Amino acid sequence: MTHQPQQSPQFFLTAPSPCPYLEGQQERKVYTHLVGDKANEINDLLTQGGFRRSQNIAYRPACEVCRACISVRILAGEFEMTRNMRRVWSQNRDLIGRVHKAQPSTEQYALFRDYLDARHRSGGMSDMTVLDYAMMIEDTHVNTQIIEYRRRGPDSFMSAKGDGELIAVALTDVMADGLSMVYSFFSPHMQERSLGTYMILDHIERARAAGLPHVYLGYWVEGSRKMQYKIRFTPQEHLGPRGWQRFEG
């Protein structure tokens, strides 16, 4: 009899449930726990294989009749902003994104709550408490960080810190080959800033500066309005049966 090493992940399959993206479809997920000394290495490998992370769980769609969820990653080194993206970048030049350890705060939760109530009132995360939020941020064994976006202050040039109100937050995993945007949220009262687009652009610039080739955006679902924004950031790669394939839009 052979024995698996203690650090080898075990995979499980969820029961069918209604798909949050395509009406009338059922979703199932295969998942594993990211724990132990190898959690960071396993998370890297699984993300490169189409998994996403939520707390200490890595999961991937395993639907019986649908293959609509496609993993997407931006080729950071080749990316060029469109005219509209340059406008968004310029419009947010008064913001500073500062990296912090993955620790929750009451200020973050207030913004998170405001975002959910305005944008995802009927979503699966709508009833998350402050303790649920804290677990989303802290319950991890992988290399992750919080990026807080604030307005620049009078001393920002010297300190590289923003001292204004918290406007946007990104929870981001740092991997061997890129940055993975786990979750992000922003003030719903500043639609003119296109903060979701801005944070993706900022992550592309951060990946470039760190010499990392990819920014992982999670899943794109053709036909889902919620997901359409992801294919605007080209060139990118989509994960299919033959591995990662280039996509130009």
From Swiss-Prot:
Function: Functions in the N-end rule pathway of protein degradation where it conjugates Leu from its aminoacyl-tRNA to the N-termini of proteins containing an N-terminal aspartate or glutamate.
Keyword annotations from UniProtKB, A to Z: Acyltransferase, Cytoplasm, Transferase
UniProt-listed Enzyme Commission number(s): 2.3.2.29
Domain of life, per lineage: Bacteria
Family, per entry: Belongs to the R-transferase family. Bpt subfamily.
Protein location: Cytoplasm
InterPro entries linked: Acyl_CoA_acyltransferase, Asp_Glu_LeuTrfase, N-end_Aminoacyl_Trfase, N-end_Aminoacyl_Trfase_C, N-end_Aminoacyl_Trfase_N
The protein, known as: Aspartate/glutamate leucyltransferase
GO (cellular component) term, any one: cytoplasm
EC top class named in words: transferase
Cysteine disulfide partners in this protein: none
Catalytic function, reaction form: N-terminal L-glutamyl-[protein] + L-leucyl-tRNA(Leu) = N-terminal L-leucyl-L-glutamyl-[protein] + tRNA(Leu) + H(+); N-terminal L-aspartyl-[protein] + L-leucyl-tRNA(Leu) = N-terminal L-leucyl-L-aspartyl-[protein] + tRNA(Leu) + H(+)
Classification via NCBIfam families: PRK01305.1-1, PRK01305.1-4, PRK01305.2-3
Lineage, highest ranks first: Bacteria, Pseudomonadati, Pseudomonadota, Alphaproteobacteria, Hyphomicrobiales
Keyword Metal-binding: no
MF term (GO), any: arginyl-tRNA--protein transferase activity
Organism from which the protein derives: Brucella melitensis biotype 2 (strain ATCC 23457)
Gene (name only): bpt
One of the GO biological process terms: ubiquitin-dependent protein catabolic process via the N-end rule pathway
